[in-house]
Amino acid sequence: QRVMMIDKAPLVGGHSALASGSIAFVDEKRQAAQGIVDSVDKFVADARVTGGSIDEELVRFIAEKSGEGLDWLQTQGVRFSPNIFRAYGGMHPRCVTAFGNMGARRYIFQLHERSRELGIETRLMTRAVGLHRFEKDKLTLRLADEKTKSEYVIQSRAVVLATGGFGANLALRMRYNPNLDYEIATTANPHGFVQDTATGDGLYLAKELGAVWTNMPNIVLLSYWGGRMLDYIGAEIYVDNEGRRFVDETTTTARIAQAILKLPGHSMYVITDAKSAKGVNVGAKITAGSIRLSNSVAEMARGMNVPASELEHTLEEYNKHASEKSADAFGRTVYAQTIDK
């Protein structure tokens, strides 16, 4: 059977190709080897906390099949890092990422290469603009070639919509969350200089066939700038424009986002040190200037334009709790390290 994959961008992968690449799973064999106790029920319970309203049946299915998913990816040539960690915004150590420094691009490139080996055709810069059923078991898909500005129609017995993100669709996202106005950039286009392809095309295509949109307000908000220096929790702090902490940095992404949106200018600084294991995107952020290196607290305070004494007090207070593994004023109890190097 002939299989064809289309992508409206010049490269495959969409936002997934830009992600750090953490994959959550439940697998007794993998987790027990590192002393981690987990279960499908706990996965579902954690999803209720981190995801808000969820399709519990779907989440349970994902959890039950997640170990098999990792196995399948490995059969396709994907290699994983050996350590299982608690990811940013997560509730339990159940994540791995691709081996090396490519993040989720490793998944995308490896699977794309495998698809080519299997004879699957890929058409880039090709947008799906219409999807209709014309017989009981046949569909018509109208495609727009972005290079030639022409349209054509193909027929198929099945169409898989592996898409649906709409973070770059300002009108649509504001319909469900009015706070996400033009000032809130997407992780794929934080500076507003490039095209972000997550405009919800797949949602509209599915709607043409009678699909119902659900859980649309559950838009994930991630702190782009320095907030993703690390892929795991416990080794960084967030401070406001006065050098003071304002949130438990190990809580859910939704709670962190709510706290950031209450700050003047919706901005914060993220601080870690030389001991932490940086994420795969840090090099690009240093080059872009969104992450800066400091040799001392005083130098860091000057760069942030905050009083050095305030920043020193913040770090001293954090390090005290980190050393004692004690709860702080924000309820934080998870610490991977002190921040002092």
Model-assigned labels for residue ranges:
Residues 2, 8-121, 125-130, 134, ...:
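Conserved N-terminal/central alpha/beta ligand/cofactor-binding core
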Residues 147-150, 154-223:
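Glycine-rich loop(s) and the adjacent beta-strand/alpha-helix scaffold that form part
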Residues 6-7, 216:
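The conserved SAM/SAH-binding core of class I Rossmann-like methyltransferase domains
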Residues 7, 134, 227-231:
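Short loop/turn motifs at secondary-structure junctions and domain boundaries
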Residues 195, 199, 203-205, 209-310:
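An anion/pyrophosphate-binding glycine-rich loop and adjacent beta-alpha core
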Residues 135-142:
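Short, hydrophobic/aromatic-rich segments at coil-to-beta transitions
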Residues 114, 125-128, 142-153:
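A structured beta-alpha segment of the ubiquitous adenosine-cofactor-binding alpha/beta core
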Residues 130, 310-341:
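A glycine-rich dinucleotide-binding beta-alpha-beta segment and adjacent secondary-structure elements
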